[in-house]
Amino acid sequence: MFEKLKKSLIEAPVVKKGDYDYFVHPITDGVPLVVPEILEEVADGVSKFGNMNVDKIVCVEAMGIHIATALSLKTGIPFVVVRKRSYGLEGEVAVHQMTGYSEGELYINGLNSGDRIILVDDVVSTGGTMIAVLKALKAIKVDIVDVMAVIEKGKGKCIVEDATGVTVRSLVKLNVVNGKVVIKGSIDES
């Protein structure tokens, strides 16, 4: 499983953003081209290995949207997008996030206390976005049933788990070594 995803990751270019090694990939960046076969592999993996006994799928703008869309179409479960701009709706929750290469505000709408959710994201790397979103979800008092990242880079998973006490799982684990993506394993190999 995940053979197309793994192959595409190994072939992904790596660019430097300051001291941060940033791999450029369709699932994490939307470029150069998001092919349906890889997106389907991702949706199949999350629906197979994730706990889908939820009311809502939650994703973060922008690169979680295509993952949540594919997953929603596959499962029939609606999704909520954590957005980068405020809509000023009643109950909107603002979240400050800081990653290895940016920082800013995120806004959560459409969730209520007691909602059972799965949080899906493209990548967990520095943990900044996921930590901020998980803390906000806890404050809203949703039931965080599962957290799945398509890609786990470096120690991001451990950083998030240490900061939030929430278990994070990923489909594929990788590191960037000497400017190249190296696959370290996948959830179906565990």
Swiss-Prot record:
Domain of life: Archaea
SUPFAM superfamilies: PRTase-like
Gene3D superfamilies hit by this protein: 3.40.50.2020
PROSITE patterns reported in the protein's UniProt record: PUR_PYR_PR_TRANSFER
Enzyme superclass (EC): transferase
Location in the cell: Cytoplasm
Cited Pfam families: Pribosyltran (PF00156)
GO cellular component, one term: cytoplasm
HAMAP family: Hypx_phosphoribosyltr
Name of the protein this chain belongs to: Hypoxanthine/guanine phosphoribosyltransferase
Organism of origin: Methanobacterium paludis (strain DSM 25820 / JCM 18151 / SWAN1)
Gene that this sequence comes from: hpt
